[in-house]
């Protein structure tokens, strides 16, 4: 697991990561406004999109709270790091992924606030196909290898008319649950973060908004098919909402509540809409 630290504080348990003296270079009235101490909170993320966290840090400056991002490339790592006390929060996964990880691995972590929906989209290898209609028998389609996003990708292929899945498997079917291939595509599984890199070896790949954005792809402009995230027509949408997660013992931590509240502001909504141009959809209760 590759890991990039923005800051080097450490800590675990109920307290935020670290508390340090605020900088002393500010002068005059500005110095008077600075809090005496800064509470640093380490947040685990996956991918390179972080503009919203810059806005959050600006909003929390007067409260003496500073978010420092720990960037992971392995989707299995942030929940393990959170559970083990290596980070304070994480913000990289949807509710279905979190529920599956807790059930499978016994993590004592919970979501404490909604953030965004990162729609899955089908991206084409432009050297091979130019539209969804051109996908044919034998074409390789790459999908995420983890259970929740892999199942989500199979449901997207079903929605697009390529396969039929066993309805009893709900929203997390596996390849073994495909009951019919309407087009005899060759479905290959790969770790989510690698899908954009292997696109040249496929006809198409199914990539979520975060990994797509990191790879320079935009679901609005570059995809040939995007997941239906309208809750009125897709009952699974509530489980696709990304969340901020904390250890269960910290679910009522006041500092963490302020971070969630800062995320749920018009300023952060504007940053997400301006920076990501449709790659992410704000999904907290009053985001509309």
Name what the model sees in each region.
Residues 149-158, 262-284:
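Periplasmic-binding protein-like
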């Amino acid at each position: 697991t590759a890991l990039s630290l923005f800051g080097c504080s450490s800590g675990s348990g109920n307290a935020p990561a670290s508390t340090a003296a605020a900088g002393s270079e500010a002068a005059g009235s500005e110095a008077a406004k600075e809090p005496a101490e800064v509470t640093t909170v380490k947040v685990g993320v996956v991918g390179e999109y972080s503009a919203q966290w810059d806005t959050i840090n600006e909003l929390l400056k007067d409260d003496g709270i500073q978010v420092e991002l720990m960037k992971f490339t392995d989707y299995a790592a942030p929940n393990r790091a959170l559970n083990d006390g290596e980070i304070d929060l994480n913000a990289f996964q949807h509710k279905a992924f979190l529920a599956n990880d807790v059930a499978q691995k016994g993590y004592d972590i919970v979501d404490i606030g909604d953030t965004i929906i990162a729609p899955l989209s089908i991206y084409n290898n432009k050297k091979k196909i130019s539209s969804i209609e051109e996908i044919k028998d034998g074409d390789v389609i790459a999908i995420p290898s983890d259970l929740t996003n892999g199942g989500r990708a199979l449901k997207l292929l079903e929605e697009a008319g390529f396969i039929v899945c066993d309805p009893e498997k709900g929203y997390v079917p596996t390849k073994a649950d495909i009951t019919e291939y309407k087009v005899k595509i060759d479905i290959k599984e790969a770790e989510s973060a690698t899908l954009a890199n292997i696109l040249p070896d496929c006809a198409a790949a199914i990539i979520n908004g975060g990994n797509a954005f990191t790879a320079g792809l935009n679901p609005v402009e570059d995809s040939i098919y995007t997941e239906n995230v309208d809750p009125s027509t897709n009952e699974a949408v509530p489980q696709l909402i990304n969340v901020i997660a904390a250890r269960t013992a910290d679910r009522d931590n006041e500092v963490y509540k302020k971070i969630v509240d800062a995320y749920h502001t018009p300023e952060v909504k504007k940053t997400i809409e301006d920076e990501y141009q449709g790659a992410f959809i704000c999904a907290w209760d009053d985001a509309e």
